[in-house]
Amino acid sequence: MSPKKDTQKSAKSTTAINKESNGFTDEERAAMKERAQELKADARRGPRGKKDKADGEGDVLAKIAAMQEPDRAMAKRLHAIIKASAPALSPKTWYGMPAYAKDGKVVCFFQSAQKFNTRYATLGFSETANLDEGALWPVAFALKELTATEEARIVALVKKAVS
């Protein structure tokens, strides 16, 4: 075999290996593609304003409607809780999931169990959330169902996050 052919074969093998083990799952790659689409849509919409809040609301409700149960019911309920607890937050999608932002920066988000094939949904908070408690505090919570107890805790967390 000539050195040129050997090099080409090696390059092809490396490419195949990189495609198989690039470190991201199919679900993660899909989420990144959704995030890129969200950024393009935001750029087309122009500067932030009331119109964008309405657009964000529509985007979030569409994502929630596309979810399967029980994630859809939890996401709908969380959407209502967050809107009532922190009306200053603007709904938007973030990596294809419902999120809520203050001054354009995500404060909290919902991640459906089906999105990443996990056994629970997640309510997460970003670094802009005011949840600090000493040197250690939780920033994500697993959700299997929403009862009155969980809802009360979420209300308190969201209010604290935006305080």
Residue spans for each PLM region:
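Charge-dense, helix-prone N-terminal extensions
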Residues: 1-163
